[in-house]
Each structure stands twice: as structure tokens, then as C-alpha cells.
Amino acid sequence: MSSPTPFKMRLVHLDLKGAPPKVSYLSEVFPLFHALGANGLLIEYEDMFPYEGHLRLLRAKHAYSPSEVTEILRLARLSELEVIPLVQTFGHMEFVLKHAAFAHLREVALFPNTLNPHEAESLALVQAMIDQILELHRDVRWLHIGCDEVYYLGEGETSKQWLQQEQNSHAKLCLSHMQAVASHVLTQHPGVTPLVWDDMLRDIPQEQLKASGVPQLVEPVLWDYGADLDVHGKVFLIGKYQECGFQRLWAASAFKGATGASQALPPVEHHIRNHELWLQVAGSGPKDALQGIILTGWQRYDHFSVLCELLPVGIPSLAACLQSLVHGGFAEDVRLRAERFLGVSSLEIADTVSEGAGSFPGSDIHALVTQISLHLRSSVDTLLERNRYVTGWFSPYHRRRKLVHPVMIQHIQPEALSLLSRWNNLVQQLEVALQPVFYPDTIEEWLEENVLPSLQRLQDLLQDLGEAAARQPPPTSPGWDTGQNP
């Protein structure tokens, strides 16, 4: 018998700093999220938010309009999904600090990761961002203000001077900025409670945390995406945070985007195990210690990294993870329920994903991306590196010199043309499937990263073969000379 979930709130994270879906696709997946057991969304807009005024330059090319944000919120309400917006206010500020207009606010001049907390203009900047986001999210109960992975904090020139004073420390520097940002949220937007990622808090001594006043201002989100999550360590951390005075705590797991910056297919078994371990944490710690859990679905590791798993490709993993949370584990009956929701005949969690098509929104993308990711590069590798005619008679040595035995053209060319035709056909199908879901720049980026390098290798082989075939007279061996007399 499945046990009920210990997590009252179960939020799906939408990471919009890469491959942001069109609103029409969100209208299709929100009801599925709800059916699978989600009751909230953490929306990380990054450069997809329609910032105005001096912040307008933060907008991406295809940023949502204010009316589209309003529509997203309406669609979320229809599916009974409570929205928590997320805005980075300390680390991961690349989408802001990459711009020349804000580069002077970097903690380290060379790196756009982290905001300089000593500049009054830095605080004014994040306050303006918060105010614009909450202007369009008037009914929210929480705002996530980020504050994770604040790399290079303390390494700026102003910080180095500040840290030379005896009473100052990296922890104090971090907590003071967190306090300033959270205080702005609480004073200017009563009723909205700030959430923060917890990694910058973990190693701060208990007494210092308690004395900072931060536990009265924010609710930490304990994040761990591993399949080897330390249950006892997390239970200990929960106890530490509670003793410091934090009123509420949250957990964060991952259903995709946590196992490799260029990962194309989510390892479902890894993600299910991560959720099973979080269930153990919730069951081992104080009752109701965790307010809820955020199922993160990262789309880029940071603003400058490549895309990882696309949202439609991650939906089977999300289904398995949400159903695990709702039913207290991923027993056989839970697997069958997940398969019914997805319209798949088999959810192969031991493999990367199931290759079978489903009936969920974006299932055609899932099926095509799976085929391409599992077989495109390997099929080209097989032809170029293990086909005996290519390796024996049209090696890189031959190709550079445009040398080929005429009979080998008949052995190599038909197979290469057939392979190229097959993959071109599948890629065209994928482009058609991607167009209703994603904007053109996302499609271009995904294909250029995941498809074009392999297709280019095939095309280069065929071009070299054609040029070698056109040479007259054909050489008799790779050692064929130029015909000059000694």
C-alpha cells in the first residue's frame, strides 16, 4: 500500500534561461503537471521576463510580453498550480552583469557571475528587478531570491579591503546582502516571503546564522540532486536550521538538468532514486519540517552553458518523480500509473529513457530526440571508424590526398548516402515537432549542438569521396608517385 506524501507543496521548476517554451505549450503541460501530482510552479524567468525602463536591455529576443506572463499565471490557476517566481539577486547574475551598462557592478571585474554587494547601486538594481516581477505577480505568497553559488564572493577589490577588518568575514558579507534583499521584499511587498537556495548557508556557524537575523526573514530551500544523497546529513542540516530560527524549510530535487551540462536525455533511474532519498529525509526528520519540495528541471547550468535536456524530453522523468512523491515510492503500481498518464507502454527507468512514443504533449519530440541522441553519433562513428572499406581504403590519409580505389566508391557511397538521407529525414521531422513548442533560436541551438556535427562528418566524407572519384587518372596505390622521372 503506497503511503501518502509528506510534501504538502510539490512545485515543478521552469528554468527559462534556455529553451523557454511557448505559452501555447505551457497550456498543454500544466494540466498534466496537476494530474501527475504537482500543485505549484517555480518560474525562473531570467531574461524571459519583460523588464521595463532601464532594465529593458535584460530581455531576451523572444522574452514573454506582460500579457503572456499574465496568461501563464491564468493557465497556472486553471490547473491549480501556485506560482512562485524566482529572480537571482546575488550569484548567477550573468544575464544582467554581461551587459556593459551593469558590468561595473561585478564583484570581480572579469567575471559576470556575482554582484558586488558593497555598491549601493547593486541593491537598487535587484530591488528594481524584484519590484517589476512582483508588479506582474500580485497574488504570490513567496518570491525566490536565488542566492546560490555566489562564486568569487570576497575576491573583489572592495571586498578584500572590507575583509581585512577584524570583525568581517565571507559569511557576514553573504548574510548582510541576503538580509538587505529579503528586507526589501518584506517591507515593500507585505505578505510575500523570500525563499533562498541554502548552499551559501550550510557551512555558516549556527550562532552566526542565528545572530544575523536572516532566519527571521527567509525560508531556505535545501537542494541536493544526487542519487547518493546523504539522508542523515540532510536530517542534521534540517535540525541545525531549525535551531537557528528558520520558521519553514523546503527541499529541492531534480527531474532533469542535473547530471551533465550537455545531457540530452535524463537518466530516469537516477532521478527516481533522488526522490526516494528525499522521501527518506522527510520521513526521518521532524514531522512537517519541510514545507514542500521543488522538482528542479534545469535547462542550462548557467547563462553561458549549452542546453541540457529539453522540457518535453524530461516529462517521463517528471511523471515518475512526481508519482513517486505522491505515493511514497516508485512501486510497480506507481510505475503503471505513470505509464497511463504518459500514454507509454513501458517506462524503462533502467535505461536512459523509453524510446517508445507516448500521448503526452511533446511526446513526438521525446521520441525523436531519443532516437537522435542514442543512435545518430554512434551510427556515423560505425561508418567512419569501423566500416572496413572506409578504414582500409578511404582513411584520413587517403581523404587528404583525394585517393580512392574506384571499386571502393561502390562500397562506401551508397551506405553513406542512405545514412545521411535517413538522418536528414528524422531531423526534418524533429524540426517540425519543435516549431510549435520552442522559438527559432532554441531550435537552431539544439540542432547545431546535437545534430549538425554528426551530419557534417557524413557530408564531408561524401564530398571527399566525390572529389577523389573525380580525379583522373585514378592512382593505383596510396604510394602512387607524381609521374616525374628520377
Swiss-Prot record:
GO cellular component: cytoplasm; extracellular vesicle; nucleus
pH dependence: Optimum pH is 5.5.
EC number annotated for this UniProt entry: 3.2.1.52
Gene Ontology BP term (one): carbohydrate metabolic process
Regulation (activators, inhibitors): Inhibited by O-(2-acetamido-2-deoxy-D-glucopyranosylidene)amino N-phenylcarbamate (PUGNAc). Inhibited by galacto-NAG-thiazoline.
Temperature characteristics of this protein: Optimum temperature is 37 degrees Celsius.
Active site: 149
InterPro entries for this protein: Glyco_hydro_20_cat, Glycoside_hydrolase_SF, HEXDC-like
Disordered, as annotated region: 467-486
Catalytic function, reaction form: Hydrolysis of terminal non-reducing N-acetyl-D-hexosamine residues in N-acetyl-beta-D-hexosaminides
GO-annotated molecular function: beta-N-acetylhexosaminidase activity; hexosaminidase activity
Transmembrane parts of this sequence: none
A Pfam cross-reference name: Glyco_hydro_20
Location of this chain's protein in the cell: Cytoplasm; Nucleus; Extracellular vesicle
Tissue expression notes: Ubiquitous.
Keyword Hydrolase recorded: yes
Keywords annotated in UniProt: Cytoplasm, Disulfide bond, Glycosidase, Hydrolase, Nucleus
Keyword Metal-binding: no
Gene3D superfamilies from the UniProt entry: Glycosidases (3.20.20.80)
Physiological role: Has hexosaminidase activity. Responsible for the cleavage of the monosaccharides N-acetylglucosamine (GlcNAc) and N-acetylgalactosamine (GalNAc) from cellular substrates. Has a preference for galactosaminide over glucosaminide substrates.
PANTHER family: BCDNA.GH04120 (PTHR21040), HEXOSAMINIDASE D (PTHR21040:SF6)
Family of the protein in this entry: Belongs to the glycosyl hydrolase 20 family.
Subunit structure: Homodimer; disulfide-linked.
UniProt protein name: Hexosaminidase D
Organism: Mus musculus
Lineage: Eukaryota, Metazoa, Chordata, Craniata, Vertebrata
